[in-house]
Amino acid sequence: MQHGRSFIGICVLLLAAACQSRDPAEPRAGPRIALVLKTPNNPFFIDMQRGAEEAARRLGVRLVVQSPEREIDVEKQMQIVENLVQTRVAALCIAPASSKGIVPALAKANAARIPIVVVDDEVDAAAAADAGVSTDSYVGSDNVEGGRLAGRHLVMASGGRAKVAVLEGIPGHETGDSRLRGFHEAIEVAPGVEVVSSQTANWERDQGFTVFQNMLQAHPEIDSVFACNDMMALGAVEAIAAAGRTGKIRVIGFDAVDDARKAIEAGSMDASIAQFPSEMGRLAVETAVRLVRGEKVPKDQRTKIGLVTRASR
């Protein structure tokens, strides 16, 4: 009998401990806000989720975070959105895996009268108009200006003479396309800066390594790289190291994730364009909550950017 009482006592203690382990800031009730990311594996989106979670705790709402495993899995992201619409979330925050491909899923959110906050990658305006899709607000960086910052830095750092390889994002992504547009605008002023190869590496580090390795073999004269995100840039850094050319090829990335900042400090990357994904996540959730409350919100909300170099750290 004594053993039975001891067992019951232990169970009670474990149950109490389990109850206490619950995050005290997590609301037991309140509107459910969905945040759909492109991937859980990119530090950029990890930071975005962190900012969103902080805002959700502070505002007393329940945050549901979901994403496909890979950024290129547009179909999976569409399925996630459709499922969230079925469960009647109060609002949807989404970083689209495809600016055009996500439009049919957003149409279902519109039909269910679920407010939509787009984060990071803008929805293609023409595709949305053709489908009769509307969104309530956009939260993100000025990617064209970020591309210009990268291009201006390359022109200055190279003295106006460079053989450049460009690692693009997924074709059709507004984010990557905007960064490329800004970059090309900036380097046009320097006729000595020549893009000798430009290919997609689909935002991924492994592909950044493979694609740039092939570029370097085809164009050994390459002395500079602009990658539309840091994951691809870090892949290029690894390919440069494998070729024994560390320190001889300048690499400029975009996002200023921790690994990129470490590479800049070590001298294996030259620069990166800093975004503030935590701020994006925070502002997206705050905007979604305002929409749920029936408040008016700005249609376009831009977060800050900046150039990170070894000198600026």
Task: Describe each PLM feature range.
Residues 15-18:
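C-terminal motif of bacterial Sec signal peptides marking the signal peptidase cleavage site
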Residues 20, 29, 167, 171, ...:
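Hinge/cleft segment of the Venus flytrap/periplasmic-binding protein
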Residues 28, 33, 77, 137-164, ...:
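Hydrophobic alpha-helical segments within soluble ligand-binding/sensing domains
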Residues 32-51, 55, 59, 64-82, ...:
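Extracytoplasmic "Venus flytrap"
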Residues 44-58, 146-150, 174-193, 207, ...:
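Short, solvent-exposed amphipathic alpha-helices that sit
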Residues 74-90, 209-221:
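Short, well-structured alpha-helical segments in soluble
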Residues 96-111, 183, 196-197, 201-262:
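Hydrophobic alpha-helical
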Residues 100, 104-145, 156, 163, ...:
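Flexible loop/hinge segments that line or gate small-molecule binding clefts
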